[in-house]
Design a protein with these regions (language model features):
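A generic fold-level signal
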Residues: 21, 38-40, 86
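Catalytic metal-binding acidic patch
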Residues: 30-62, 74-76
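Short, flexible, glycine/charge-rich loop motifs used to bind or transfer phosphoryl groups or to couple energy/partner
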Residues: 16-17, 34-36, 141
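Secondary-structure boundary/capping positions in well-ordered alpha/beta enzyme cores
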Residues: 22, 70-71, 181
Length: 205
């Protein structure tokens, strides 16, 4: 597995060389950000520049080509203004799930309201519902099913926050504080993530 601390040092050095004095925020999302990475985990880097042009995207792409494990690097690249004008319901978990390396997303997160969080939950739940029905009827894909459980886990994070005002970032902690029916969904997601077999019909239900 990647030694993430060493990787980040190399990454930030390359980023500063590519964009001197232009990095407003840099952070780490996903499994590595939560300390839940496996051998198959991507490295989800978040970079917010002072502004972003097509030329900047090409520069960033060339920068990534100089780094180890290029095939594992993914994430989010944006300009500051674009992020500040993003759909607020998407910013809730985007900000909460990002471990800062440089800068802060607190200003962005402060614009998110309880109505935005409710919209994120509803939109996420609708997406999971439609995805499950579509997959059972047409795709019949275990990979899609696993992705739906991942999406459901983020919905449950938001639901718990809406109920309690507490954002539980780590799934292993969240599973113990959810009601039994919701906890079972999260437990299944964690088993699938750790290499467990997908039982298509039962897990689709």
């Amino acid at each position: 597995m990647i030694e993430i601390t060493e990787f980040i040092k190399k990454y930030m050095t390359a980023l500063d060389q590519a964009f001197p004095d232009r990095v407003w925020f840099a952070g780490l999302q996903g499994s590595y950000g939560r300390g839940e990475a496996t051998e198959a985990s991507d490295i989800d880097m978040v970079v917010i520049l002072d502004q972003l042009s097509a030329s900047d995207i090409r520069t960033y792409d060339a920068m990534l080509d100089t780094l180890p494990c290029r095939e594992l690097i993914c994430g989010f690249l944006s300009g500051r203004q674009e992020l500040e004008n993003w759909e607020p319901s998407e910013l809730f978990q985007f900000c909460r799930d990002t471990t800062p390396i440089r800068g802060s997303l607190d200003q962005v997160l402060s614009s998110v309201t309880s109505a935005d969080i409710a919209r994120a939950i509803k939109s996420g739940a609708c997406g999971v519902y439609h995805g499950c029905v579509h997959n059972m009827l047409y795709e019949k894909s275990e990979d899609i099913l696993k992705g739906l459980y991942k999406s459901a886990s983020f919905v449950l994070q938001a639901v718990h926050f809406q109920r309690t005002g507490v954002y539980v970032r780590h799934m292993a902690d969240l599973v113990s504080v959810l009601p039994p029916e919701e906890s079972a969904v999260l437990q299944t997601f964690m088993e699938l993530k750790n290499g467990g077999a997908a039982v298509f019909d039962a897990m689709s239900e």
